[in-house]
């Protein structure tokens, strides 16, 4: 598995974060974006723009996501917005859309030890306030991943 995204996807993500979480300082969001790009080698997909006009999705504004997935050779688009990524449209490119909860559960079933290690590492990185794996699971549940959170608590 190799996470990939585009500058445009990050723009949308961080605009939504800024709008929905005004308590997070702009500088923190900027730093998080930089850390994400540094943490995942070769994460930025480019050269996908010419594919956009030929694609059909219920929401035309989501075509850039599919175009980037095609360009990256992705097998999965991880999104909570499943209705705008219909199986019939994605299947012709060998791509499927998965809800983040389903995706994390797939990872858990493939290598539960590593997923638990990632949860522990995330908790250990929290400083203010300090976190525990249970806290990370609480955040996952609150973010719409209740099945994964419950599995990781076991």
Residue ranges and their predicted role:
Residues 62-95:
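Acidic, metal-binding active-site segment of PIN/NYN-like and related structure-specific nucleases
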Residues 42-55:
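Short, basic, glycine/proline-bearing loop/turn elements
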Residues 26-32:
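A metal-dependent, Asp-based hydrolase signature
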Residues 20-24, 94-97:
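Short, hinge-like loop/turn segments at secondary-structure boundaries
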Residues 57-58, 145:
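Long, charge-dense, solvent-exposed interaction surfaces that engage phosphate-rich ligands
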Residues 1-22:
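PIN/NYN-family metal-dependent endoribonuclease catalytic core
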Residues 34-42:
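Ligand-binding beta-strand-loop-alpha-helix segment within the catalytic cores
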Residues 83-154:
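Acidic, PIN/NYN-like endoribonuclease modules and their adjacent C-terminal/linker elements
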């Amino acid at each position: 598995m190799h996470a990939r995204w585009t500058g445009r996807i990050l723009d949308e993500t961080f605009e939504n974060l800024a709008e929905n979480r005004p308590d997070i300082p702009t500088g923190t969001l900027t730093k998080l974006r930089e850390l994400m790009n540094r943490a995942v080698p070769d994460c930025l997909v480019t050269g996908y723009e010419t594919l956009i006009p030929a694609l059909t999705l219920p929401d035309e504004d989501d075509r850039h996501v599919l175009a980037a997935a095609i360009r990256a050779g992705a097998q999965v688009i991880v999104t909570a917005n499943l209705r705008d990524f219909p199986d019939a449209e994605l299947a012709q490119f060998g791509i499927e859309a998965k809800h983040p909860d389903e995706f994390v559960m797939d990872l858990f079933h493939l290598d539960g030890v590593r997923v638990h290690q990632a949860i522990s590492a995330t908790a250990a990185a929290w400083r203010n306030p300090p976190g525990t794996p249970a806290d990370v699971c609480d955040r996952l549940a609150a973010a719409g991943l209740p099945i994964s959170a419950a599995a990781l608590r076991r």
